[in-house]
Amino acid sequence: MTGYENKRFVHRKELNTEWEALWIWRSRRVRVNDFAYFRKEFSVRCPLKRALLFYSAHHTAAVYVNGTRLGGYVSPAPTNPEKRKAYLAYDVTELLADGRNCLTADAHYLGGSGQNYYDGLPGFRLQLQLVYEDGTETVVKTDASWQALKEMPHAVGTPYQQNRRVSAIEAYDARKLDPEWRYAGWRKEGATVKAKPALIGSDDWPMEAQRIPEGAIAEEIKCVKLPQPNGGEAEFAQVFDAGAIVSGWPRLALKGVEGTVVRLRYSEDLDENGRVKHNVTNEFSDRYYDEYTMRGDELETWQPDFSFKAFRYVEVTGYPLEIAEGGVTVCWAYTGMAQTGEFSCSAEHLNKLYAACIRTQKNNTLGQTVDCPHREQAQYTADTDLQAEALLYNFEAVEVVAKTLADFTDAQLEDGTFPFVAPINYENPDFHIQIPEWDLHYATLMWKAYEASGDVGILKNGYETARRMVDYFLSIRDADTGLVPLDKGWHISDWPYPSVEHKGQFLTVQQIKLVLALRAVGRAAALIGRAKEGGTYAEHAERLSERIVEQLYDRERKRFRDSSESDARHQGVTAIALAAGLVPDEDRERAIASVAEQSWECRTVLSLPLLRMLFDNGREAEAFALLDRTEYPGWGHMIAQGSPTMWEGWEDIESHSHAWNGYPARLLQEYIVGIRSETPGFAKTTIRPYMPDSLTFAEGKIATPFGPVSARWERTDGGVRVRATIPAGMEARLTLPLADGRIVEQALTEGENEMFFAK
């Protein structure tokens, strides 16, 4: 799947509806991991011009029209419903028939104060607007006339699968749902009760059309059945390998054995006996499974798709028969954004690195950008800022990033700071956490989304949030030093397993990130008509930059100290300072050389500014060497170990599908292929490749607001051949450094460009 396409899904930003429908639930009681099964019959008279169906749920629902399931999965996308509640819209005209029709919905409420959502209250809301050819209109809406199933196939109150209470075990008993339930004419005395008004008032939650695509099944993976596990267990276990870690769920297609409880357990890895481990990455969990109780049909199919799981291996227990090929399929699912980026070159390990970055990014876009798709599924500003590198170059993802910004706007605290993730149950003591450095990424993420899209609306929407955030940090500056001291929360300069020292009250990386945030806020203000404020924030950034140099720069060694009382001069601290332009001009070349020639000590967070600084300052060879290496540490080491996804850090010990390590994909496209934006929105674009001696060709394509841009360079016996495709409306140039020291400058035209440069 290159993009999610559902013809019934109405995906228009301007689509709105006046809500008449009530929020309903099956009772007035709030229970964790609760379900409700709803049903409504109604009449349609043809000819029907158009039928639009709108629905929302807290937290998710699956809606059926005459037995046909609508749309995608794990919908609506998570938000703080008190600030905005997403709803979906579908054109269902073709699904309705003359006469009696039936709507059904299966809704799920999580509750439980988990890490990556907002508890809110249970509820389901649907409105079907029927427009006839004669101009008349009718509305079918949720109210007390809807039926709710008394005894549901989904068990209520099942345990959470992770320690962070992200998703619940689906325990589904197929015997409890009559197959005719979803069709008009079903009758069963005493099987239903009238739906109750939910505890949510009709106007309590602001309704907003969902702007990002729904979850979609991208690929149905035919699993490889592994040999029977060792260990002599009495339990009959059958283990299946999807070939890589995927987000999604398994699908069963098995001969039914009535009353048999089939358990599906998930993990990234296996134990020494070939069984699926009882864990969620590096955290123990005995509950990372779902269960299906069989009805006894000749063929039964089922998939636990109310939540995203992430795993490579599926272990089936409880089923007494040998499972043949096709009995277990893994559905790889994620937010259905179109992939438009590409990269390939003559080095296969770099092609595998790019593919692993993209696969990992897909795994971590699940209605929100998440750090990992299994342990937390949580949305962090810093993680999204790093992910935005690959996201915005390779996918139609501006709306996905905009949702992250909106989620943090909704979560912003009174003083302008943020919880460490959003959405979140911040009142839960387990998740009452803040990371000050991560707050500062809000402003740089906002600017990054603007640079990719050229859409000033992103700045208008995020400016007040970003302004309030930087104002907080300005308000706590130390009067003597002018620097921001250690404050509430958990401070991170680099991650994971960092070696940056945090000694004293003032952390250098935090100061530099505040400078970058102030600059972003200042530029944003200027672009949205608030020039005076823009000038003020630019002045704050300049003064803070001066204070950082005064207080934290070692002029003798041409390096920045890690913190105010540290004797360490970490590579990454000076790298981010160089990237931010804070090193005095007279020392800059020596500082660049010092960082470039040092052994690699940065982790994931500081390796991005390190690489960008090297590529942008004439040290392309050193930067490429870090991308190209296959030994520890680095991304290539993961590939050399056979991993098809990116890990949380360099070590093979925690999450093995962590998207913040996916930014090498963008760096390969931007620096090796050479596709670079010169102005926000790619109105001006330069093709300037770095052509390392170890490669004979490299090619790539990226998404821009004007359309795709592609480029390819290739060495031949006689010279270098370059091809570039430029969309209409874009101003583009080729800047090509040749081996003899010449730099070729040439304008590119709309459409195909092919050039050859002799040795």
Which residues does each PLM region occupy?
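Active-site acid/base region of carbohydrate-active enzymes
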Residues: 60, 125, 143-151, 323-356, ...
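Alpha-helical support elements that line or immediately flank enzyme active sites
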Residues: 51-52, 249-268, 306, 317, ...
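Short helix-capping and inter-helix turn/linker motifs at the boundaries of alpha-helical repeat units
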Residues: 32-33, 242, 378, 436-437, ...
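Non-catalytic C-terminal accessory modules of carbohydrate-active enzymes
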Residues: 127, 141, 147-182, 186, ...
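Active/binding-pocket-proximal capping segment
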Residues: 61, 70-73, 77, 408, ...
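Extracellular/oxidizing-compartment recognition motifs
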Residues: 1-375, 383, 399-402, 415, ...
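C-terminal capping/lid segments that line or modulate ligand- or cofactor-binding pockets
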Residues: 155, 163-172, 376, 394, ...
